[in-house]
Amino acid sequence: MELTTRTLPSRKHIALVAHDHCKQMLMSWVERHQPLLEQHVLYATGTTGNLISRATGMNVNAMLSGPMGGDQQVGALISEGKIDVLIFFWDPLNAVPHDPDVKALLRLATVWNIPVATNVATADFIIQSPHFNDAVDILIPDYQRYLADRLK
């Protein structure tokens, strides 16, 4: 597949997602990094977003809850180039009914080459990166060329 460049803006659009057993871990992480996160645009699946907003007072664009389609909504935003970073604390020790949605979300984040953290250590590395508040170029699939080739 041919690639093109997308610029992640200095003011990032960050998706926050956490499975039930990981919500408190994400809440603690958000509270610890609140001053920095407040400079960006936040999205989250339903329950997680409402919990974050209630605990911190931050504005969070809440989707549906993950099992009700929220993971897929976040995935769609990634595909549309509207999410720049995914922080997704998922529970690897407990299966969830919407496991296919979880796999699809992680697959889309990989396809569209956005930074992804699935644990606290990686989330800390991302948010503490010297480039976190900078505009950064990433390579993404050239969808227009892909579509043109498919329609030949």
Swiss-Prot record:
One of its GO terms (molecular function) is methylglyoxal synthase activity. It is an enzyme of class 4 (lyase). GO terms for cellular component: cytosol. Disulfide bonds: none annotated. Keywords: Lyase. Substrate binds at H19, K23, T45, G46, T47, T48, S65, G66, H98. Pfam families: MGS. This is Methylglyoxal synthase. It comes from the Bacteria. Gene3D superfamilies: Methylglyoxal synthase-like domain (3.40.50.1380). One of its GO terms (biological process) is methylglyoxal biosynthetic process. Belongs to the methylglyoxal synthase family. Catalyzes the formation of methylglyoxal from dihydroxyacetone phosphate. It catalyses: dihydroxyacetone phosphate = methylglyoxal + phosphate. Residues 6-152 form the MGS-like domain. The active site is at D71. The keyword Lyase applies.
